[in-house]
Amino acid sequence: MAMAYLAWRLARRSCPSSLQVTSFPVVQLHMNRTAMRASQKDFENSMNQVKLLKKDPGNEVKLKLYALYKQATEGPCNMPKPGVFDLINKAKWDAWNALGSLPKEAARQNYVDLVSSLSPSLESSSQVEPGTDRKSTGFETLVVTSEDGITKIMFNRPKKKNAINTEMYHEIMRALKAASKDDSIITVLTGNGDYYSSGNDLTNFTDIPPGGVEEKAKNNAVLLREFVGCFIDFPKPLIAVVNGPAVGISVTLLGLFDAVYASDRATFHTPFSHLGQSPEGCSSYTFPKIMSPAKATEMLIFGKKLTAGEACAQGLVTEVFPDSTFQKEVWTRLKAFAKLPPNALRISKEVIRKREREKLHAVNAEECNVLQGRWLSDECTNAVVNFLSRKSKL
């Protein structure tokens, strides 16, 4: 959530510098000038159809839609070229300018054709690696299954390293609320693909409210607080199966789980200070308790990346397994847990956790308030500029 807000704020800011920052690719469109021209009504219907898409078409397609819309309604690009650090507006300008002198009628037709090609996404589902049994419906970013007394919530954006976008935040909350009431005995979170989760998705910057950056920061803080609260209040045993690298909030939340099992190829990284931010997920409280204040400081403030073995030695991870046998060993154990008396598990968790719950909610509220201020700071924006410039040189 923090990363997504920062990406948007960075994109809105023009910083005079010689740094080269990654931006969206210039859109290349193949136009058919002899195609039948779409009517104005067809054009308007297509604009409405875009709002009904259930699956995010991706940034490149969004830029194409933007460019074609501008070309169809205003003609060739007539805006001055934005500065190099005004990432979003520069990407929009590049996309629109690439259309050259394409007639409005042709742009309108291409807009209609593009939207028509996207229509299958109204019914498409998220991609799942072969062998994954999808038994849930209604989720675009998750695979949720319930079998053998286990509800499994799998992050399902493997091509994006399971980065958490706004839709996934809401879907995880919905899945947790459903799992708290279903017949399963335990609930497991894991990732599809090579990553457990790479943390927040930096492309969460398009839904900007009329109130601008201040309202965006406030809304994100409210969402983050509610999201973390779902983990604090979850009544059943909650287990993380960390199948690969974990970054940011996917790490900080682990202090709220009842058990954490990791592959030996997993790593744990919280680069908050590098991005001018502060801890989240109650980690400012749970991590010092779990691993000592000194070790928590090394990770949360100085951004040390832990191996699975180091995370286990410091108490963040329950047990580490060889990657070659990880899935088999862990799921054998989880199936055994799911055969234990369910009421005993819930009651025992309540006894262990209830004294901390009020404190955790207070910590969560404080962390979100602090982050709201950090997201609005120049220091935070500058840190993200430096991060993106380094990334572009890799």
Swiss-Prot record:
Annotated ranges, domain ACB: 39-124
Chain residues that bind substrate: S198, G199, N200, D201, L202
Site positions (Important for catalytic activity): E280
Reaction equations catalysed: a (3Z)-enoyl-CoA = a 4-saturated (2E)-enoyl-CoA; (3Z)-octenoyl-CoA = (2E)-octenoyl-CoA; a (3E)-enoyl-CoA = a 4-saturated (2E)-enoyl-CoA; (2E)-tetradecenoyl-CoA = (3Z)-tetradecenoyl-CoA
Modified sites of kind N6-succinyllysine: K51, K55, K62, K70, K81, K90, K92, K161, K289
Statement: the UniProt record of this protein carries the keyword Cell inner membrane: no
N6-acetyllysine modifications at: K51, K62, K92
One GO MF term: fatty-acyl-CoA binding
Residue ranges of the region described as ECH-like: 151-322
GO (cellular component) term, any one: peroxisomal matrix
Reported function: Able to isomerize both 3-cis and 3-trans double bonds into the 2-trans form in a range of enoyl-CoA species. Has a preference for 3-trans substrates.
Full protein name: Enoyl-CoA delta isomerase 2
Organism: Homo sapiens
